[in-house]
Amino acid sequence: MGQTALARGSSSTPTSQALYSDFSPPEGLEELLSAPPPDLVAQRHHGWNPKDCSENIDVKEGGLCFERRPVAQSTDGVRGKRGYSRGLHAWEISWPLEQRGTHAVVGVATALAPLQADHYAALLGSNSESWGWDIGRGKLYHQSKGLEAPQYPAGPQGEQLVVPERLLVVLDMEEGTLGYSIGGTYLGPAFRGLKGRTLYPSVSAVWGQCQVRIRYMGERRVEEPQSLLHLSRLCVRHALGDTRLGQISTLPLPPAMKRYLLYK
């Protein structure tokens, strides 16, 4: 199977990424990422919650970013403002590599998951109320103290994927899965069995003064009908490929059709 490329993913693709098996992304993800991103108001509406975070975290820019204070022997978490129980959702996390430290965990949590611990740990995923991927160690955590945590994505023995600054979190509440995408490639489901819950974007951090950004990419619901016009646009864009979308303006098409193909 060839690599499953997705639109609007991170442009930084590690060379080791090709060593990992790829998976078909959740139904509707390509369409979600091909659409214009939500405006700034909507992104803040789905951003970090200043009222639902550790006391050592300062939420900034209306929810688009948080900064962890330099407190020793503390792990600190934050939840998003919106919880999701239906539909397909995707959001981008930006976390500089030099600001991750020993435990940098990205995932989802219920409203009951703890947001602070008096030691350094993978807080997100430490109990039954949260699920997380440690993007430094490449380990998955759920009800875990870190012992025998599975590697994600599964690859050649001893080979660990270097996670770039930007990664995409993909939560499919229709199928009950949580997965991740980097460099435009979906890495497959990391967790299953999430149906019936309300889950919030979440991270836990240990690095003093780290700044972690969130950018909500949108939502798709299974009951949303897809028009023939919309499906035709997807086919044309897929046939051109990301590298040739700039040539749409040169095609012998009416101006209105060109604008539609470019989501203008």
Curated annotation (Swiss-Prot):
Coiled coil: none annotated. One of its GO terms (molecular function) is ubiquitin-like ligase-substrate adaptor activity. Keywords: Cytoplasm, Ubl conjugation pathway. Its main location: cytoplasm. GO terms for cellular component: cytosol. Residues 222-264 form the SOCS box domain. PROSITE patterns: B302_SPRY (PS50188), SOCS (PS50225). The keyword Phosphoprotein does not apply. Residues 1-19 have a biased composition (Polar residues). Changing W207A: Significant loss of interaction with NOS2. Pathway: Protein modification; protein ubiquitination. Belongs to the SPSB family. Substrate recognition component of a SCF-like ECS (Elongin BC-CUL2/5-SOCS-box protein) E3 ubiquitin-protein ligase complex which mediates the ubiquitination and subsequent proteasomal degradation of target proteins. Negatively regulates nitric oxide (NO) production and limits cellular toxicity in activated macrophages by mediating the ubiquitination and proteasomal degradation of NOS2. Acts as a bridge which links NOS2 with the ECS E3 ubiquitin ligase complex components ELOC and CUL5. PANTHER family: SPRY DOMAIN CONTAINING SOCS BOX PROTEIN, SPRY DOMAIN-CONTAINING SOCS BOX PROTEIN 2. This is SPRY domain-containing SOCS box protein 2. It comes from Mus musculus.
